[in-house]
Amino acid sequence: MTFGEKLLNAASTRGRLCVGIDPHESLLTSWGLPVNVDGLAEFSRACVEAFADTVALVKPQVAFYERFGSAGFAILEETIQTLRERGCLVVSDAKRGDIGSTMAGYASAWLDPASPLSSDAVTVSPYLGFHSLDPVFELAEQHGRGVFVLAATSNPEARELQDQQNADGVSISQQIVDQAAALNAPYMAQGKAGNIGVVIGATLSKPPRLSTLGGAILMPGVGAQGGTASDVDEIAGDMAHLAFPNVSRSILATGPDIAEMKNSVAKNAADFPGFPRS
C-alpha cells in the first residue's frame, strides 16, 4: 500500500491534522522542564501520550533532537517507534538533501524498515535538483513510505527563490509540484494516492497548482502563523482530501497537561475532517 493510501485511511478516522513535536528551548522552559536530555525525554513522552491515539500524522522536528547528539537521537528513535506502534503515521522533519550515495544514506536512515529511525515519511529539500532525490523516492516506492518535498514554503524568505520562473514562465515551486505529480501519476490513474507529497505553506497568496499532484500535501502555517481552514481548502482545491495542515505551536502551548493537549487536538482537528473510505 502506498503512503498516500495509508494516510487517507488514517485520516478517515482521525482527521487530516498533522501535529508537530517541536521541543525547542523556550517551550521546554515554559513547560517547566530542564533544557537538557531529561527535559527532551519528558517533553517527548507527554507528546506521545497526547497524540498517539488521536492524530493521523505526527511530525517530530529532528533538529531539536539532533542538538543533543546521540542521546537526543536515542529519544527520537523511541518517540518514532512508540508513535508508530500505537497507530500514528510519523513524518520525520529532517529536510535532508544531497546527491548519490549520500542521499541514499539519508534515505536508508529515515525510510528503511531496518533503521532505528525508520519513519513513515521524511521531508526533503530539492535544492540540488529534484532528481538528486531519486534514492529516497526509490526507497519510498520499495517500502510504501512517503516523501514530502519542499515546494512552496510559508517562510517569507522563500519567495526570492521558489517564485523564480523558467523561460516558459513556470515557477520553481510549480516545477517541483509537477515533477512530484509525474511520480504519482501511475497511482493516480488507478484512483489511488501515491508516495510523493509536497510541502506547501497555508499562508501563500500565489500557491502552485496542485490539481494533478496525486499525493499528500503537508501545509505548515495554520494557526499561530495566520493560516485558516478556508486557506487550506482554497490552496489544495481538488486535492483537499490529501491536505494535512500542520498545527504545532497552539497545541504545544497547552502542555504539559496531556488532557489539555488532547482537547486542543480535538478542537483543531474538527476543522479538518477526513473522508470516508470504501
Swiss-Prot record:
Q: Its pathway?
A: Pyrimidine metabolism; UMP biosynthesis via de novo pathway; UMP from orotate: step 2/2
Tell me which EC number(s) this protein carries: 4.1.1.23
Q: Which residues form the active site?
A: K95 (proton donor)
Please list the reactions this protein catalyses. orotidine 5'-phosphate + H(+) = UMP + CO2
EC top class, as a word: lyase
* Keyword Lyase listed: yes
Biological process per Gene Ontology, one example term: 'de novo' pyrimidine nucleobase biosynthetic process
Tell me if Lyase is a UniProt keyword of this record.
Answer: yes
**A Pfam family for this UniProt protein?**
OMPdecase
Instruction: Name the Gene Ontology molecular function terms of this record.
Output: orotidine-5'-phosphate decarboxylase activity
Keywords, ordered alphabetically: Decarboxylase, Lyase, Pyrimidine biosynthesis
The Swiss-Prot or TrEMBL record describes its family as follows: Belongs to the OMP decarboxylase family. Type 2 subfamily.
Name by which UniProt lists this protein: Orotidine 5'-phosphate decarboxylase
